[in-house]
Regions:
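Alpha-helical transmembrane segments of multi-pass inner-membrane proteins
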Residues: 3-4, 36-38, 42-48, 71-76, ...
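N-terminal signal-anchor transmembrane segment
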Residues: 32-125, 154-158, 443-445, 461
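Transmembrane alpha-helices of multi-pass inner-membrane enzymes
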Residues: 45-48, 119, 307-308, 434-507
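Membrane-interfacial loop-to-transmembrane alpha-helix junctions, especially the N-terminal start
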Residues: 79-90, 133-146, 193-199, 266, ...
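Short aromatic-rich membrane-water interface segments that cap or initiate transmembrane helices
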Residues: 99-105, 227-239, 341
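Aromatic-anchored transmembrane helix interface
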Residues: 112-116, 140-149, 162-184, 204
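Long extracytoplasmic/lumenal interhelical loops at the membrane interface
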Residues: 221, 231-233, 328, 336-397, ...
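Hydrophobic transmembrane alpha-helices and their immediate junctions
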Residues: 263, 396-442
Length: 507
């Protein structure tokens, strides 16, 4: 009698397997001995660059040049070995650098250096991911971002002023590369979003503190002729500061219902202070778009809040003198003392749009050149309308890229909104998603009257909301992490039983 053994294990034996971490992300190689040599080279290059800049711009203090370039070199080393750390540091410090120009730095701008560093490090990181097999197929929104950049390249090539357009293309490249990097890491592990939000929250500290100092001590009259003291925080213009605040404050508000008590109090304080400074920028477009975003957010949290927000906005508009005069001044054609207004009213914008529209006939296909409108008008100003700017400066190609990006983002936002309404998300995911939609809508509303298209610092933070919505919509292999941090079990049970038929002896 011959017994044939099968490979199957008896039914009584449990096969325990190590659970695969659902949310773990890939690890890149750790620094080796070569890192010390690379750091030494970075220090030498930083000092050499500082001496070079010193010879070109002798009025710039050497300590600022050397310190900035050394910091950039060190940050670059961090990015080559730990890109997530690099990304978080960049998001935390970028708002502090926007206005570091002119007196202290001359033509030397730390924000520009950080942008170039972000391009180089992020490009190397993405290439490294692809070479290592870690690259994930971008979402449709990722492809839309790439198309947005590619379709503006002809605009740069045929630009009437390539010097101006060159800087704008660098800014656009940094936006697209950072978006792709954020999307890739969220596809790896959606919990990374929490770290991004924390880093971005830390980035609000310097602009808020600077804004308060300006409001109480060092504020200056608005050069646009409004007669008001407008604050710009650490940004180059009050409108940019207001756009940044409208997006950031809405995201913070959306997080409040998901936090523990002590963190909730911090978020409430931060959103209150941010809203106060937003009012103090006297940027009317940002006021209206922020109100729109808060109404949308309130409609998903508690519909009774809608009436409270409308009533509060009305009281501020009527009761605060500066706000009331700013709203009344919206359609005025003259400034204080009867002086003609420059760029401070809807009427001026309509007139300016009419004057610059003939520029579209110069090169209908690729436009006059990205960021080149201001070089062709006596006012030397941007179009103050991002839709018009995309067509005038990018031509038909640029407009296709920009409108396609907006269409794909709108589709993603609509899909996420519908899923949130159906209750398909956990508590935290729901509020973050709705907050991202409200914040993005708030900025999108400013595209009609503000220069948002090439506002690099704003786009860097819009990328967070865009990438979150894209991963939720199309990242089928990536699930949003639960509120706790423990790893979830795989969908398939690790306990397997052998079917009875597989454990029989054959004679």
């Amino acid at each position: 009698m011959t017994t044939f053994e099968t490979d199957a294990e008896p039914a009584s034996i449990r096969v325990d397997r190590e659970p695969e971490p659902v949310f773990s992300g890939p690890e890149l190689p750790t620094p080796g001995p070569m890192a010390f040599f690379v750091v030494l080279v970075a220090v030498v290059v930083g000092l050499a660059g500082a001496f070079g800049f010193q010879s070109l711009a002798p009025d710039t203090p050497f300590v600022i040049l050397g310190g900035t370039l050394l910091s950039a070199a060190a940050l670059g080393i961090v990015g080559l070995y730990r890109y997530q750390w690099f990304l978080l540091i960049v998001l935390a410090v970028r708002p502090s650098l926007d206005d570091l120009i002119a007196d202290e730095f001359g033509t030397f701008q730390p924000s520009a250096i950080l942008g170039i560093l972000a391009i180089l490090v992020t490009a190397l990181h993405l290439v490294g991911r692809r070479a290592s097999g870690l690259w994930k197929r971008p979402t449709p929104l990722g492809f839309a971002f790439m198309g947005f950049f590619v379709l503006f390249i002809p605009s740069f090539i045929t630009s009437v002023d390539r010097g101006i357009s060159q800087g704008a293309m660098f800014g656009l490249a940094s936006v697209v590369l950072l978006y792709l990097a954020i999307e890739q890491h969220l596809l790896d592990d959606t919990r990374f979003l929490y770290k991004i939000l924390i880093a971005s929250g830390l980035g609000m500290i310097v602009p808020i503190v600077t804004g308060f100092v300006q409001f109480f001590f060092t504020g200056t009259l608005d050069p646009g002729g409004s007669g008001l003291v407008r604050i710009d925080g650490s940004f180059a213009h009050p409108n940019t500061f207001a756009t940044y605040l409208s997006f950031a404050v809405l995201l913070v508000i959306s997080l409040i219902p998901t936090l523990e008590l002590k963190h909730k109090l911090v978020a409430i304080a931060a959103s209150g202070v941010g809203a106060f400074l937003l009012v103090s920028t006297f940027a009317r477009g940002a006021w209206g778009s922020f109100l729109l975003g808060t109404l949308l957010l309130a409609a998903r949290i508690n519909k009774m809040l809608v009436f409270a927000i409308i009533g509060g906005a009305g009281l501020i508009g009527v009761g605060v003198p500066g706000v009331r005069s700013r709203i009344v001044n919206l359609t005025s054609s003259t400034g204080p003392g009867g002086a003609p207004k420059t760029d401070d009213s809807i009427g001026w914008r309509f007139g300016y749009w009419e004057r610059i529209w003939p520029l579209s006939s110069r090169n209908p296909v690729s436009g006059v050149g990205i960021d080149a409108t201001k070089t062709l008008t006596p006012e030397a100003k941007d179009p103050h309308n991002s839709f018009l700017q995309a067509y005038l400066e990018g031509g038909i190609l640029g407009a296709i890229g920009f409108f396609t990006l907006l269409a794909v983002a709108t589709y993603a936002a609509w899909k996420v909104w519908q899923r949130a309404r159906r209750g398909e998300f956990d508590h935290r995911t729901k509020f973050i998603s709705v907050g991202a939609i409200a914040a993005l809508l708030s900025v999108a509303a400013q595209l009609v009257t503000e220069n948002v298209l090439l506002n690099t610092v704003v786009w860097w933070y819009l990328n967070i909301g865009f990438a979150h919505l894209a991963v939720i919509t199309w990242g089928h292999r990536s699930r949003f992490a639960p509120d706790h941090t423990r790893l979830a079990l795989p969908a398939a049970s690790p306990v397997q039983h052998v079917p009875p038929a597989a454990n029989t002896n054959r004679r």
